[in-house]
């Protein structure tokens, strides 16, 4: 399927668009992560970014993509509440890989938010959703518009949570192609790739964290816990960036 034809999927009605996406996802399911990235770089619209939380295993997708497109913009949404170790990790990887880092934040500072709304993360699911919208969803939407993004690479995996079990490799959200190259990777495959390529993991990994977000809504992984229970007090897994 030609790049020209794929770019024009958005002009089709929903039924035709979904049929083509189903065919493309079947194709991508037979590819390796490296092949998916190469295919996307060649066939999808060329105003491309990747997003990264610079979390526990974020180095994997960063390494896979920058090998093929070193100057790709790497979008980070900074809530102002990341762990100090995360900020240090961002600086370290940016310098090591010469990343084209693009940082976006809420238009309201964290201090001003607390003065205006209090500690939203302590106000149940509604407070968390409002917090995520201000600090993650709105800045990401601004980034997508500011950078005129047509194709978005992200590192979601099906084994991370129940909410990600049925995700496709390729989707279209608000006219933007979204590609998930390591969607089918297991934790073991992630660990093997990190080891084989001598890549760094987040400093908090060795302190018992399996997933890292904001300081106030991230817990250490305790025996018997699911990874998704370490975030947002177990009330939810997604922050809104990757929801419909």
Swiss-Prot record:
GO terms for molecular function: phosphoadenylyl-sulfate reductase (thioredoxin) activity. GO terms for cellular component: cytoplasm. Pfam families: PAPS_reduct (PF01507). The keyword Oxidoreductase applies. Its main location: cytoplasm. Keywords: Cytoplasm, Oxidoreductase. It is found in: Cytoplasm. The active site is at residue 239. Its EC number is 1.8.4.8. Pathway: Sulfur metabolism; hydrogen sulfide biosynthesis; sulfite from sulfate: step 3/3. It catalyses: [thioredoxin]-disulfide + sulfite + adenosine 3',5'-bisphosphate + 2 H(+) = [thioredoxin]-dithiol + 3'-phosphoadenylyl sulfate. One of its GO terms (biological process) is hydrogen sulfide biosynthetic process. SUPFAM superfamilies: Adenine nucleotide alpha hydrolases-like. Catalyzes the formation of sulfite from phosphoadenosine 5'-phosphosulfate (PAPS) using thioredoxin as an electron donor. Belongs to the PAPS reductase family. CysH subfamily. This is Phosphoadenosine 5'-phosphosulfate reductase.
